[in-house]
Amino acid sequence: CDTSSVSAEKGLIIRGKPLLDITHILPEEVFFLLLTGRLPNEAELSELNNEFSSYLNIPEYVWKVLSEMPNDAHPMTMFNTGILAMQGESIFRKRYDEGMPKTEFWEAILEDGIRLLAKLPALGAGIYRMRFDKGDRIEPDPQKDWSGNFVHMTGLPDDSGDFHKLMQLYFMLHCDHEGGNVSAFASHTVASALSDPYYSVCAGLNGLAGPLHGLANQECLKFVLSVRDKFNGLPTEK
């Protein structure tokens, strides 16, 4: 994989650009950078944003499926279920069944990827509000960027904009995992069978759910919160 690497001296490098040099760019720009090896110009970014904006909404049947899950279902299980429920929307699957030539496989895969990526913030935020009883879902705002929309749809206050900046950086840090870890390897393996992105992304999420992979983030947060509680709040700068 040549889309990203980790250097002992420079840290995370995405398509030849050190992370610290591109912390100001939008997730949509990172997506374009990963695919093409360069940052988009203004017209290309606008076109990509318009493409994303066309596919922000989650089909209602997905919410119905999720609403029937147990109240104590893990958000990752719900997230995975939501994506898999949308597999019938796959452009690749439909075109493959119609006899699409191999030379056009990449086009259908890319279309699936864009449509799925566009929906993930609404799915994740909607599951958060559903799972933790935060009220009705909040509709996406097509004027906001990918990370900004996620923050908006969680309903969490962000008057300072710090949460938006944090999510923007967090998404960038996790945008590409070289290919050697469990989730990336699982996704690549499933995709190699010409399973569409809905299937392959779900395979990666199943690996990500393990305590030696993505679930470690949750365990780490639990530890940090326990330390905070033990010392009665956040530490001072001293």
Which residues make up each language-model segment?
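Hydrophobic alpha-helical bundle cores within soluble ligand-binding/oligomerization subdomains
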Residues: 1-238
